[in-house]
Design a protein with these regions (language model features):
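Hydrophobic pocket/interface hotspot
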Residues: 13, 25, 60, 97, ...
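A generic "alpha-helical surface" signal
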Residues: 4-7, 51, 58, 115
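A solvent-exposed, acidic/Ser-Thr-rich amphipathic alpha-helical stretch
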Residues: 31-100
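Short helix-to-loop capping/linker segments positioned immediately adjacent to catalytic or ligand/cofactor-binding
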Residues: 13-15, 68-75, 108-111
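A beta-strand edge to alpha-helix "cap/lid" segment located at domain peripheries
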Residues: 81, 86-153
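Short, low-complexity N-terminal intrinsically disordered segments enriched in polar/charged residues
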Residues: 1-23, 27-31
Length: 153
């Protein structure tokens, strides 16, 4: 049952991003939280800095506001393919999981390309019956990341 809840959380998370409902994205996280995008090499070496780093829901909301109002980038959409999570139940009601992902980027002109592959390294907690991410570290397989990394992975 827990595995199904985690898989459902991942599906809803991906759908919100893919459907351009970015304003809902921060709601998948606790406050405080950690959201970071990094490379597999940096993650393996324990380097804290990420391509994107946020440690509160407010920072996630600011990122969405910047995407909507301030940043200029070519219109694009993502399509996530998310694998099944490998769970590691933890202490204090927290659940850890690693989940593989693949993201295809679709540009305004219809061009599609493989944008990112990797795994989500998550710590989740139950808040009032709903699972939320306390930590989501997006570990990209490649250290080469397109400069158009605008939308959350």
């Amino acid at each position: 049952m827990l595995g199904e809840r985690v898989a459902q959380l991942n599906a809803e998370y991906a759908r919100a991003i893919d459907d351009d409902r970015l304003e809902q994205w921060p709601d998948f996280f606790t406050d405080p939280c950690l959201y970071k995008i990094t490379s597999a090499d940096n993650h393996r070496r324990g380097l804290e800095a990420g391509l994107i780093y946020a440690d509160s829901r407010g920072m996630l909301q600011d990122r969405v506001a910047a995407l909507r109002e301030a940043n200029i980038y070519e219109r694009q959409a993502y399509r996530h393919l998310v694998g099944l999570p490998a769970l590691r139940p933890g202490d204090d009601g927290m659940v850890s999981a690693e989940t593989p992902f693949l993201v295809v980027r679709v540009m305004r002109d219809g061009t599609m390309d493989l944008f990112a592959t990797g795994r989500y390294v998550d710590v989740m907690v139950d808040e009032g019956g709903a699972l939320r991410f306390r930590e989501r570290i997006v570990v990209c397989d490649s250290s080469r990341v397109d400069t158009l990394l605008a939308i959350p992975l």
